């Protein structure tokens, strides 16, 4: 069994890494070999080992297969901005062939590979292209992470619509409560369950420092494994 999924978000800061970690933890509980892959990350810190992005480091730690950082995050861009701006600032060209080569490598070594996106679905990686082009090229099934807050319904439904229009398979979604004060939470979830028309993998409650916690209990990984 080898499965790969792309983790998309309705926007930046909606909890893609939190949801990815939760899914990785749930899969680890089933004794599966997992790898978290962050092809492009904008916003990295200089370390003695080189540039490191905190989200990519969280994925590296949550996975069950040990992988060198450079293979988890081939493009660790310094500037915390849209990837196309950060890449231009550093005079870097994001090469889809590199992303595909790393993905193929991960597929050989894991039962499940989670590929975490950057920003939202149409995030630019150059002046003329978006990361979604590469996702379409790889024909990756998509899991949508919805940060539950005011405005998320429109963002979620629009993103799901575009993913499907791009010819990709939206296989599930995760609710991540990013604001503990969001009103009408249950009603928002009900609407998303009705309108997204794909399985909900789980609901992650608001948890301070969630990226540092074990989140597997909030995810039903069987939905992905049965695909």
Curated annotation (Swiss-Prot):
ATP binds at residues 13-18, 55, 116-119, 176-177, 205-207. GO terms for biological process: biotin biosynthetic process. GO terms for molecular function: ATP binding; dethiobiotin synthase activity; magnesium ion binding. It catalyses: (7R,8S)-7,8-diammoniononanoate + CO2 + ATP = (4R,5S)-dethiobiotin + ADP + phosphate + 3 H(+). Keywords: ATP-binding, Biotin biosynthesis, Cytoplasm, Ligase, Magnesium, Metal-binding, Nucleotide-binding. GO terms for cellular component: cytosol. Its EC number is 6.3.3.3. Pathway: Cofactor biosynthesis; biotin biosynthesis; biotin from 7,8-diaminononanoate: step 1/2. InterPro entries: DTB_synth_BioD, P-loop_NTPase. Mg(2+) binds at residues 17, 55, 116. It is an enzyme of class 6 (ligase). Catalyzes a mechanistically unusual reaction, the ATP-dependent insertion of CO2 between the N7 and N8 nitrogen atoms of 7,8-diaminopelargonic acid (DAPA, also called 7,8-diammoniononanoate) to form a ureido ring. This is ATP-dependent dethiobiotin synthetase BioD. It comes from Vibrio vulnificus (strain YJ016). The gene is bioD.
């Amino acid at each position: 069994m080898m499965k790969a999924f792309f983790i998309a978000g309705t926007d930046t800061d909606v909890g893609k890494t939190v949801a990815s970690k939760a899914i990785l933890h749930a899969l680890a509980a089933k004794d599966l070999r997992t790898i978290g892959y962050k092809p492009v990350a904008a916003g990295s810190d200089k370390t003695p080992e080189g540039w490191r992005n905190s989200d990519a480091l969280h994925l590296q730690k949550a996975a069950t297969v040990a992988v060198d950082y450079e293979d988890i995050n081939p493009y660790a861009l310094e500037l915390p901005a849209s990837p196309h701006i950060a890449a231009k600032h550093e005079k870097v060209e994001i090469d889809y062939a590199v992303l595909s080569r790393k993905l193929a490598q991960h597929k050989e070594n894991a039962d499940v590979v989670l590929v975490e996106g950057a920003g939202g679905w149409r995030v630019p990686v150059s002046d003329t292209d978006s990361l979604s082009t590469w996702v379409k090229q790889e024909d990756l099934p998509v899991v949508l992470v919805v940060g539950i807050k005011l405005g998320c319904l429109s963002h979620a439904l629009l993103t799901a619509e575009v993913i499907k229009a791009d010819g990709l398979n939206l296989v599930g979604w995760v609710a991540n409560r990013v604001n503990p004060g969001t009103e009408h939470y249950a009603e928002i979830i009900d609407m998303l369950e009705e309108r997204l028309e794909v399985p909900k993998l789980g609901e992650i409650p608001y948890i301070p420092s969630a990226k540092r916690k074990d989140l597997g209990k909030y995810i039903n990984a069987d939905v992905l494994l049965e695909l």
